[in-house]
Amino acid sequence: MANVLDTLMERGYIKQFTHEAETRELLEKEKVTFYIGFDPTADSLHVGHFIAMMFMAHMQKAGHRPIALIGGGTATIGDPSGKTDMRKMMTNETIAHNVACIKKQMEKFIDFSDDKAILVNNADWLLNQNYVEFLREVGVHFSVNRMLSAECFKQRLERGLSFLEFNYMLMQGYDFYVLNKKYNCKMELGGDDQWSNMIAGVELVRKKSQKSAYAMTCTLLTNSEGQKMGKTVNGALWLDPEKTSPYEFYQYWRNVNDADVEKCLKLLTFIPMDEVRRLSSLEGSQINEAKKVLAFEVTKLVHGEEEATKAKQAAEALFGKGGDMSNVPTYEMGKDKLGSELLDILVEAEIVPSKAEGKRLVKQGGLSLNGEKVADFKKTLEEADFENGEVLIKRGKKNYNKIVLA
């Protein structure tokens, strides 16, 4: 049987290891318990988290046991990695709500039945921790000089790094120590932006428990130009259908750049590599077939086959190939809004994030109403604009929404 490490490397997941040869041997000989941490900074996971869950799912399919750690405790501080400013502090009530929402989402992707995976919250051991005891037990193993040289702190030192955030590395390292002690967890997986924090955890386990511990980082989801993927005009690409509709989600992947198709097929689907290579080798207009497969498969994993099929049908209907128009994202508007400015209605319907963005679209010729380009910022929406009680809004080349009179 192939080592899961070969699968992960072939599909492009692995960025860095702490101990590559030992990790390979461990994954061949044992069913390894490993963990990935997720901070509950919002009430939904987004596409950046999805790649981490795919990483976990490949490991679980190979017989290893994942621990999904929700950072209910560390979220009270906020991770400074990759941030230029201190994160806004959240209330305990907000964190608890976000944790509950994220738990529900995770269960779609990871099998938690019969102890095949474990869900834990570090609030259980961090929030009641005695601070002096923590410093004596954990702080003694950390060098401030070494911490200050870590990439996650370097970029913050000039702008100001609070002592609160400086503790984050100790707390994340302590998570690994607790999981190692309680569940014999031997490995931490995470995004490449977590490398410094992960090394700290590995070293803490090795020093304090005298046990072997390992870390592997996953590549971040970036496009061919090195920019993070998963951002839309309305913000992040969420996994919650209330925040990003299955249709919008499908359309995002249907419209990725040609150069990004192969990477996305590798990282975000379970399609066998032979088929990934075949799809990725398509050229010209044929690459659109690969994009349709990508969009359908990713949407199916996140929202289920039924929603993926509806999104596909909606896209086909809008591009003149038949299909069901009823699945296009729809906003119901009361008749009392007739005569209001179109841009105000689009902002209220969350079709555009702001009036300024709406004006930019109009200026660039990127906003259409029933196939006619909107040229006037102050265009009002009148009853005459509605055909059979609805209007079709098009943003850019391929984003559609319907407004119906309620």
Swiss-Prot record:
Q: Where is this motif: 'HIGH' region?
A: 40-49
Q: What is its main location?
A: cytoplasm
Keyword terms: Aminoacyl-tRNA synthetase, ATP-binding, Cytoplasm, Ligase, Nucleotide-binding, Protein biosynthesis, RNA-binding
UniProt-annotated binding residues for ATP:
K231
Q: Where in this protein would one find the motif 'KMSKS' region, according to its record?
A: 228-232
Instruction: Read off the InterPro entries from this record.
Output: aa-tRNA-synth_I_CS, aa-tRNA-synth_Ic, Rossmann-like_a/b/a_fold, S4_RNA-bd_sf, SYY-like_C, Tyr-tRNA-ligase, Tyr-tRNA-ligase_bac-type, Tyr-tRNA-ligase_bac_1
Reactions that this protein is recorded to catalyse: tRNA(Tyr) + L-tyrosine + ATP = L-tyrosyl-tRNA(Tyr) + AMP + diphosphate + H(+)
Localization: Cytoplasm
The record ties this protein, via Pfam families, to: SYY_C-terminal, tRNA-synt_1b
Q: Name one GO molecular function term.
A: RNA binding
List the GO biological process terms: tyrosyl-tRNA aminoacylation
Which Gene3D superfamilies does the annotation name? HUPs (3.40.50.620), RNA-binding S4 domain (3.10.290.10), Tyrosyl-Transfer RNA Synthetase (1.10.240.10)
Subunit info here reads: Homodimer.
What protein family is recorded?
Belongs to the class-I aminoacyl-tRNA synthetase family. TyrS type 1 subfamily.
Record's HAMAP family? Tyr_tRNA_synth_type1
Main role?
A: Catalyzes the attachment of tyrosine to tRNA(Tyr) in a two-step reaction: tyrosine is first activated by ATP to form Tyr-AMP and then transferred to the acceptor end of tRNA(Tyr).
What is the protein name given in its UniProt record? Answer: Tyrosine--tRNA ligase
| Organism name | Clostridium perfringens (strain SM101 / Type A)
Gene name? tyrS
